[in-house]
Structure formats: C-alpha cells, structure tokens
Amino acid sequence: MLEKVVIVVHLLMALGLVGLILVQHGKGADAGASFGAGASATVFGSQGSATFLSRITGILAAVFFLTSLGLAYFAKEKSDALQHIGLPDPAVLEQKQEKAPAADDVPVLQEQSKPAESAGDVPAAPEQK
C-alpha cells in the first residue's frame, strides 16, 4: 500500500517538475511566455516569478529524489524477500549454450566441365569486329 502511494507521489512530482521547468523564464529564451509566464511579474511582484518558481522547483526536485530513494528501497526489499523464499538467482539459471560449429557454411558450386583457358581471375574480353 505504501509503495503505491510513493509511486503516485513520484509521478506527480515528475509531472510537476516538467510543468514548472517549462513555465520558467530562461536566460535569452522566452519559451515560458507562451504558457502564461509573461504576465508573472504582475502576479508575483517586481522581482517576477524567478525566486518563487525556483524555490518550488527545488522543493519538488527534493521530493522527487526522496521518492526515488524510497522506490529503490522497496525494490531492494522485494529482491531480498525472493532470496529468503529460496528461489534461485536468475543469473545462475541462465547458462550459455555453446553452438556446435558448422562443418562448412560456404555452399559448394558444381565443378565446371572444362577449366578456364587463362590462368588469371578475369575472363577474356570478347573480340570486337
């Protein structure tokens, strides 16, 4: 039950971080203005939204990292529980099966009835009239 709550909080923090980062003004990049951040100076005062959004982004990032650590802890507990049950390690079960080498992978052509007239690899050019 607690793991599901942590997963939901983790997803909400991820979506919140993406939204906040898109809304913020970057140096030289005003992509946030298209999402309504252009009028934020009137809402948040003369400093604008930089400090407010930066603080909220930092808090969401900290909660995101904490939920990530929590999910790692839950994953570790599940793997330890599987080992205590007596299930073998999947890496031990997986064995390499050596492939038997083929005798000859190159197809054999039928032998020609008469040998080539020249000793070179290139056939003779036809005579011109």
Curated annotation (Swiss-Prot):
InterPro entries: SecG (IPR004692). The keyword Transmembrane helix applies. Residues 93-129 are annotated as: Disordered. GO terms for cellular component: plasma membrane. Coiled coil: none annotated. Signal peptide: none annotated. It is found in: Cell inner membrane. Keywords: Cell inner membrane, Cell membrane, Membrane, Protein transport, Translocation, Transmembrane, Transmembrane helix, Transport. The chain crosses the membrane at residues 5-25, 56-76. One of its GO terms (biological process) is intracellular protein transmembrane transport. It comes from the Bacteria. Pfam families: SecG. It is a multi-pass membrane protein. One of its GO terms (molecular function) is protein-transporting ATPase activity. Involved in protein export. Participates in an early event of protein translocation. Belongs to the SecG family. This is Protein-export membrane protein SecG. It comes from Pseudomonas aeruginosa (strain ATCC 15692 / DSM 22644 / CIP 104116 / JCM 14847 / LMG 12228 / 1C / PRS 101 / PAO1).
